[in-house]
Structure formats: structure tokens, C-alpha cells
């Protein structure tokens, strides 16, 4: 099944003529660390930005401590809560941020030492916090800073210090990180796995006990490195540097792009060499990917955009509400 192309001009590049009543205020400069904003990520109802000096601030709905303010208050909905009034995220002395990914009830950040730290709902954090069961990290006094444990299995202070994280993506309730040991890339995923979105051959929640492996078994592609990871609501996609991609997890609407609606990654014998690559249009490769709620899109090497999965509300941009 070849994936349907959606016009990038219609979806992304059309210049709309807004009236003054629609945009009656000039955008305000967001103050973060006396510098500009370099990275932003949006969760379900909270947002995080990293500035060019590699410091971070988060705001929005604060349940489960996901904004890292050591409380559950919302920030950004009242006066004197943004700019200089908004606290910086603290993950430990001397540590700065290189990437951030926000989910529904948690936030994860890639740290400058190659580790990942997460806060929010405990069972999603992939760290010792998960072993405490229900509850949250970041919603109470002295729960941030150096007290936040690292995600297990990679990073300089882990039991596998040779593996360092180089990118991260968070879905609704799971997270994945591309890791590297200076010779090859690997993938680690943790959180809820009810649809196989972790790619670990089960539907278990992973990372909430000390003995669970987060190592995702990907096909042996002859040393081709990993370029990008994108976690959707209940599926995950990975892009290799040669432009091939693969997806696993929930597939009720065909969002995995494999010509069927069979879920992948929730049972044995579905990952590794058995993992199917996405059926991109003939002769095309992908340069960037994005996984959403039951849908996936890829920018192709010819500049076109391919989207597939759930067509509800016209989200695929194919002038139809049909699944693709």
C-alpha cells in the first residue's frame, strides 16, 4: 500500500491574510534566560522551552508535578507568572538542557552529560521514582534538582555508562531515547506499553521496577545510524539516516504504515528482523517524521509530505476523513 501524498503547500506553506482583529497584539518576547528560545515542546496542557543558554522553563497545567515547580499549581494563566517570575527548571547543580519532551502527565529532559531525567507521574519516569508506585515526582518540596534520579540503562551514572542519550521523544504516556556508545546507535523506551508502543514485545509498563529492560530490538541495517525518534499517543516511529523508517504500537487506523491494521510490538516475534519498514511512496525516503494521535506524517526527500492513519476531522490533509 503506497501512502497518500498530501500537498505541503496546502498544509504548511499557504500564507493566510489575518486581520488586525485576529492578531491585535504583537507577539511578546518570551523571557527565559536573557537569551532567545532555541527549543520548545508541548505536552497535553503544559509547555517547556530551552533558551540559547541551555536553561529551561515550563508552564501550564501543573498536575503530577509535570512543570517541575515542586507543586501542582498552573502557571501562565495569571499576571506575574511568566518572564522573570517563572522559575527555571532545576535538575541538579552544573547540569543544563540539550532537549526536552513533554507528555500528558510527565516531562523528560536530555541533560548535557548524556543522561535523561523525567518528572511527573511516577510510573512513567523510567527511574527509581517509579519503584515507589503511585504518586508523582516534582509536585512537592525538594523533589527536583539533584534528587531527580536518571532514567535507567544509559548515561554516565548508570549501570551502562558507555551509552549516552542523544535525542528524546515523549508520547502521551511513554518515552523513547536514541542512545549511542560511540560506535553504534540504540533505542531505549519506557512508560506505559498497553498497545506495544514501547516495542518490547509486551503490553507491560516498563521502567517502574529495577529489573526491566528498556532495550528496543531494531532490525540490523548494516550499521546505518538512527536519525530521529517520534513518540505518538500510542505508537512510536523511528527514522534511519538513510531515510527508511519503521513504526510500532497501536495500528487501529493504519498509522504504522505497513498495509494492515495489526498492532506491532505487543507480542513476541514482531520486532527485530521481523519489524516491517514503512511503505513509503515508490522511490522516496523520509527526511523528518512526526507521530501523533493515531496518525503519522513524513517529509519526503522530494519536499512532499506523506501522511497516513486516522483521517478524522481531515487531520491527514487529504481532503477526506477516510483512513489512509
Predicted features and spans:
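Sec-dependent, cleavable N-terminal signal peptides
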Residues: 1-29
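Surface loop/turn motifs at the tips and blade-to-blade linkers of beta-strand repeat domains
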Residues: 32, 89-92, 218-221, 279-281
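Beta-rich catalytic cores
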Residues: 36, 43-44, 96, 103-104, ...
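Conserved core positions of repeat-based scaffolds
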Residues: 46-49, 58, 106-109, 118, ...
Amino acid at each position: 500500500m503506497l501512502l497518500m501524498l498530501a500537498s505541503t503547500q496546502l498544509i504548511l506553506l499557504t500564507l493566510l491574510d489575518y486581520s488586525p482583529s485576529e492578531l491585535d497584539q504583537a507577539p511578546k518576547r518570551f523571557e527565559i534566560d536573557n537569551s532567545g528560545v532555541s527549543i520548545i515542546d508541548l505536552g497535553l496542557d503544559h509547555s517547556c522551552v530551552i533558551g540559547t543558554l541551555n536553561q529551561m522553563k515550563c508552564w501550564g497545567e501543573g498536575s503530577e508535578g509535570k512543570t517541575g515547580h515542586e507543586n501542582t499549581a498552573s502557571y501562565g494563566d495569571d499576571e506575574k507568572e511568566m518572564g522573570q517570575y517563572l522559575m527555571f527548571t532545576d535538575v541538579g547543580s552544573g547540569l543544563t538542557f540539550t532537549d526536552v519532551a513533554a507528555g500528558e502527565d510527565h516531562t523528560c529532559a536530555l541533560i548535557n552529560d548524556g543522561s535523561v531525567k523525567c518528572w511527573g507521574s511516577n510510573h512513567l519516569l523510567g527511574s527509581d521514582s517509579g519503584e515507589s508506585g503511585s504518586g508523582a515526582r516534582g509536585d512537592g518540596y525538594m523533589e527536583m534538582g539533584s534528587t531527580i534520579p536518571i532514567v535507567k540503562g544509559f548515561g554516565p551514572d548508570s549501570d551502562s555508562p558507555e551509552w549516552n542519550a542523544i535525542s528524546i521523544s515523549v508520547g502521551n504516556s511513554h518515552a523513547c531515547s536514541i542512545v549511542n556508545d560511540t560506535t553504534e546507535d540504540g533505542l531505549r523506551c519506557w512508560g506505559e506499553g498497553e498497545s506495544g508502543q514501547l516495542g518490547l514485545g509486551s503490553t507491560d509498563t516498563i521502567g517502574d521496577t529495577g529489573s526491566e529492560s528498556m532495550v528496543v530490538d531494531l532490525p540490523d541495517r548494516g550499521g546505518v545510524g538512527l536519525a530521529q525518534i517520534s513518540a505518538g499517543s500510542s505508537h512510536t516511529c523511528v527514522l534511519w539516516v538513510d531515510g527508511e523508517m519503521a513504526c510500532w504500537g497501536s495500528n487501529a487506523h493504519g498509522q504504522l504504515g505497513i498495509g494492515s491494521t495489526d498492532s506491532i510490538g505487543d507480542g513476541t516475534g514482531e520486532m527485530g528482523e521481523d519489524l516491517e519498514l514503512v511503505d513509503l511512496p515508490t522511490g522516496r525516503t523520509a527526511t523528518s517524521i512526526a507521530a501523533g494521535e493515531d496518525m503519522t506524517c513524513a517529509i519526503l526527500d522530494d519536499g512532499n509530505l506523506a501522511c497516513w492513519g486516522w483521517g478524522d476531522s481531515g487531520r491527514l490533509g487529504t481532503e477526506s476523513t477516510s483512513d489512509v
